[in-house]
Swiss-Prot record:
PANTHER family: CHLOROPLASTIC LIPOCALIN, LIPOCALIN
Disulphide bridges: C83-C179
Assembly and oligomerization: Monomer.
GO molecular function: small molecule binding
Protein name from the UniProt record: Lipocalin
CDD domains: lipocalin_L-PGDS
Domain of life from the UniProt record: Eukaryota
Protein family (similarity comment): Belongs to the calycin superfamily. Lipocalin family.
């Protein structure tokens, strides 16, 4: 039993060391991240992503400030024959560009980092999602337009691989017109 507890402690410590090295946008400017974004790329090692990735398509995400100084993040995406919305609140931390979020519906905790953004073209984000003993990495690429340059797509894929994700974990989301005007 002691060995099992020690193993879990070492795994948690290793994860902390690895994820502590994820960069955050220098001089993060929250007011410039606000507004509408298109979900261009998604990468994850979660079982959910692997089982659903063939069905995933581009989505829209709108980021707005809350009255208490945090961020509301609402993603609208096509699901079967309808548009579905998923809302999260990104809670600010002491480090600009790093946020926390909880999903009571799914019982998961999220640590979100804005890795890199030029604010008017693209944003690269890194999320660690924890649910029970399961820890997953999510890398997301957003654009102000539905298409981004091949160089930015490569940057996203390279960053995802640097986080331990494989080609099979990485998806450039297929473009769609479904749900794009629902925002």
């Amino acid at each position: 039993m002691k060995g099992l507890v020690l193993s879990f402690a070492l795994v948690a410590l290793s994860a902390l060391c690895v994820y502590g090295d994820v960069p955050i946008q220098p001089d993060f400017q929250e007011d410039k991240i606000l507004g509408k974004w298109y979900g261009i790329g998604l990468a994850s090692n979660s079982n959910w992503f692997q089982s659903k990735k063939q069905q995933l398509k581009m989505c829209t995400t709108v980021i707005t400030p809350t009255a208490d100084g945090n961020l509301d993040v609402v993603a609208t995406f096509p699901k079967l024959d309808r548009c579905e919305k998923k809302s999260m609140t990104y809670i600010k931390t002491e480090q600009p560009g790093r946020f926390l979020s909880k999903s009571p519906r799914y019982g998961s905790d999220h640590v979100i980092r804005v890795v890199e953004s030029n604010y008017d073209e693209y944003t690269l984000m890194h999320t660690i999602k924890t649910k029970g003993n399961e820890v997953n990495t999510i890398v997301s690429l957003f654009g102000r337009r539905k298409t981004l340059s091949p160089e930015l797509l490569d940057k996203f894929q390279q960053f995802a691989k640097e986080q331990g994700l494989t080609d099979d974990n990485i998806l450039i989301l297929p473009q769609t017109d479904s749900c794009m005007s629902e925002v």
